[in-house]
């Protein structure tokens, strides 16, 4: 893990409550901690001039959606991002999807879900229940985009939006 990632990760508060969507008030407590962690991550990214995603959720915090973007050669590539919180959360990490990239890379599952099994899922398992959505973005989606998006651009598979 590079120093930039380590410093970004240290700035994201850890979650303390082990709760999933079925856990009532405990889930609401965890959801509050997740929002605080996401806000801290976004503020840290903006301060570091590395702002790259925007997220919101339904009222129960079980369906998340937003935008993420990547700059390549001074051109912005923007994508819809979405995921559901699994019933077994936080033991099971959310499966983050970029639907418009579905089928465009081998490192993706059906529906545009990005492949995180080799690198991120073991890290998530070791850090359950401390990791949350902000950690999944910092250690999962961010590195995935850093590898996959430039490759897709260079191959001419994706184009910037007009």
Swiss-Prot record:
Keyword Manganese: no
Gene3D superfamilies: Ubiquitin Conjugating Enzyme
Active site: 115 (glycyl thioester intermediate)
Keyword Oxidoreductase: no
Family, as annotated: Belongs to the ubiquitin-conjugating enzyme family. UFC1 subfamily.
The organism's place on the tree of life at top rank: Eukaryota
Cited InterPro entries: UBQ-conjugating_enzyme/RWD, Ufc1
PANTHER family for this protein: UBIQUITIN-FOLD MODIFIER-CONJUGATING ENZYME 1 (PTHR12921:SF0)
Disulfide bonds, paired cysteine numbers: none
Gene Ontology biological process: protein ufmylation; response to endoplasmic reticulum stress; reticulophagy
Gene Ontology MF annotations: UFM1 conjugating enzyme activity; UFM1 transferase activity
Keywords: Ubl conjugation pathway
Species of origin: Caenorhabditis briggsae
Protein name: Ubiquitin-fold modifier-conjugating enzyme 1
Quaternary structure and interacting proteins, as annotated: Interacts with uba-5.
Function summary: E2-like enzyme which forms an intermediate with ufm-1. The intermediate is formed via a thioester linkage.
């Amino acid at each position: 893990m590079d120093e930039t990632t380590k410093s970004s990760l240290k700035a994201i508060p850890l979650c303390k409550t082990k709760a999933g969507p079925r856990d009532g008030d405990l889930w609401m407590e965890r959801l509050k901690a997740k929002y605080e962690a996401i806000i801290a991550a976004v503020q840290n990214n903006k301060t570091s001039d590395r702002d790259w995603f925007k997220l919101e959720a339904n009222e129960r915090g079980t369906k998340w959606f937003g935008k993420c973007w990547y700059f390549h050669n001074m051109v912005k590539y923007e994508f819809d991002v979405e995921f559901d919180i699994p019933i077994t959360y936080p033991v099971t990490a959310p499966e983050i999807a970029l639907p418009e990239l579905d089928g465009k890379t081998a490192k993706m599952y059906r529906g545009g879900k990005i492949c995180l099994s080799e690198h991120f899922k073991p890290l998530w398992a070791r850090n359950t229940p401390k990791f949350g959505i902000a950690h999944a973005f910092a250690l999962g989606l961010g590195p995935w985009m850093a590898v996959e998006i430039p490759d897709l651009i260079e191959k001419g598979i994706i184009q910037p939006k007009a």
